[in-house]
């Protein structure tokens, strides 16, 4: 496969059974083949997108001394600001060429889950507000994607609903600053797989994001202006015994002629509640597909991966 498939969530939301079933088949096949799709028909409107990017640019343009006030020790980067070069890919020690800011759930979950409070930026109330609105729109979109995948897997359509309601999801605003000197080995984001169930990515409209296909080739993952890129994370891959693929991807450094440019990218990492069991689904195991993963909860898996990323000591 040389490019990621495109699907329209409007087909799944349609009253037309044929369109709905075609969406389920197409997204399921894409996630079995390459683990990525470009999705249109989501719940983000363009005005919200424009406001979000304006506020993200404004925040990252603040002096480091101001931004660093929002880097809270002891949170493993799960809320607020994480400074440049602090996070690295699993199995690497060289930090990625990025800084980022995390938003989590804005209301305390009613299911008893306890998460760190969001870090509010005093200098920009609008940044806090647009983050909350974007979180809600992407969470809603992700819910319907998971409903389609549940049906593809032969599960009840609402199988994932109780696990993602009040889940430990994170909206991450990323700034890849201009490159000022030849990187020795660092990339904007080194090759990695995502931790969570699914990731919904804004900002894949230009070259930079690459996906490794089954032939071991790196292909560009480029979306249209009205599309999100959505990929399978390691939690969902484990749960389905790798039937749905968590594909390795990276953000490569631009050509030298574009070093002076910043890049902004905004992924939404959809996490379940921490006590969700990621045990392999029984009907994803057979003699040709033996169980590949040990039993673990989402919370245990997250802690393990935060240590791998250098965010938890």
Model feature map: region roles:
Residues 1-313:
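Peripheral, non-catalytic segments flanking oxidoreductase cores
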């Amino acid at each position: 496969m040389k490019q990621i498939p495109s699907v329209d969530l409007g087909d799944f939301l349609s009253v037309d059974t044929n369109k709905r079933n075609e969406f389920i088949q197409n997204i399921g096949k894409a996630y079995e083949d390459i683990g990525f799709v470009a999705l249109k028909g989501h719940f983000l409107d363009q005005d919200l997108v424009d406001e979000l990017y304006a506020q993200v640019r404004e925040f990252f343009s603040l002096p480091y001394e101001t931004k660093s006030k929002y880097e809270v020790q002891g949170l493993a980067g799960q809320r607020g600001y994480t400074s440049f070069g602090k996070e690295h890919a699993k199995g690497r020690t060289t930090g990625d060429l990025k800084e980022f800011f995390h938003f989590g759930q804005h209301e305390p979950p009613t299911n008893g889950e306890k998460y760190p409070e969001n870090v509010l930026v005093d200098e920009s109330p609008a940044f806090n507000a647009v983050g909350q609105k974007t979180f809600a729109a992407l969470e809603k979109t992700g819910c319907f994607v998971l409903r389609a995948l549940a049906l593809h897997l032969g599960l009840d359509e609402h199988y994932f609903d109780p696990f993602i309601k009040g889940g430990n999801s994170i909206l991450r605003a990323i700034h890849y600053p201009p490159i000022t000197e030849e990187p020795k080995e660092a990339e904007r984001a080194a090759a990695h797989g995502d931790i969570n169930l699914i990731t919904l990515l804004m900002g894949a409209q230009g070259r930079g994001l690459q996906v490794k296909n089954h032939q071991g080739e790196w292909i560009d993952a480029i979306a249209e202006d009205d599309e999100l890129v959505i990929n399978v994370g390691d939690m969902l891959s484990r749960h389905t015994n790798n039937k749905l693929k968590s594909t390795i991807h990276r953000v490569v450094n631009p050509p030298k002629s574009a070093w002076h440019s910043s890049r902004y990218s905004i992924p939404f990492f959809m996490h379940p509640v921490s006590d969700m069991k990621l045990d392999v689904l029984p009907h994803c195991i057979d003699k040709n597909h033996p169980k590949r993963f040990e039993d673990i909860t989402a919370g245990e898996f997250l802690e393990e991966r935060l240590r791998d990323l250098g965010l938890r000591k």
